[in-house]
Amino acid sequence: MPPDGSAPADTIPRATTYVICSSMYKMIREFAHEQLVTNDKSQEIARQHATYFLTLVEETEPKLTGSAQQGWLNHLEAEHDNIRAALRWARDTGAVEIGLRLAGALWRFWESHGHFPEGRKWLDYWLTCPMGDTNGAPMWTRAKALSGAARLADRQGAYMQSEELAAESVALYRAIGDHPGIAHALNALATAVADQHDYVRAEAWFTESWSYGGNSAIAMTRQ
């Protein structure tokens, strides 16, 4: 140590470096924390966005038939980019039930506005989701998505696939005793079978569909 008690010259750079590094690490920690907080807020906003559009889609779905249907279909078309963002968020975060519910409620919109490839892509994804077991979602959610997927497959000429999807939907709806659901899925099954020219089975399925759904099932066959 020098006679005046000051620190040796060769220790000054090391001490200075230590102080600088400590300050940098502190700044990095603070920045990382701020980013985590920001990301948490962004994720929460994205979740709320997806939840909002799930509610919108599910509340709009029953209005997609009848005299006012075109206005509601156009409303969904205007929000299509937001709906796509909600579907992507559900996919990217593994929110299987939200994604399945969105897709299941959107099939009539996709069908009416000709978004067949997009609709089938999303429905196929959620029904065979690699990020989670869709069987863990409520049974009616899967049954509804299967029925919608059957409709879109039939519209694109995939009649055998449509039949398989509709048959699984019927089985699930039967298991939970959902009569309107059974009527709708049987109608989809009958349509797929009729498109394969199996009119005997088609008539049987249509007849059973009417027995479960009454006038509502008959209306579905005319849409």
For the regions a language model picked out, list residue spans one by one:
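Short coil/turn connectors between adjacent alpha-helices in alpha-solenoid helical repeat scaffolds
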Residues: T38-K41, K63-N74, W107-R120, R151-E164, ...
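Short, well-ordered secondary-structure microsegments
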Residues: F31, Q35, Q69-T134, T141-G148
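Tetratricopeptide repeat
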Residues: I83-A86, G119, L123-W126, S162, ...
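Amphipathic alpha-helical segments of tetratricopeptide repeats
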Residues: L87-R88, L127-G132, A167-D178, T207-I218
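Tandem amphipathic alpha-helical repeat scaffolds
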Residues: L100-H113, T141-Y159, S169-A171, G181-D198, ...
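Short acidic-capped amphipathic helix/loop micro-motif used as an active-site/signal-coupling element
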Residues: A46-G66, L87, A103-L106, W126-L127
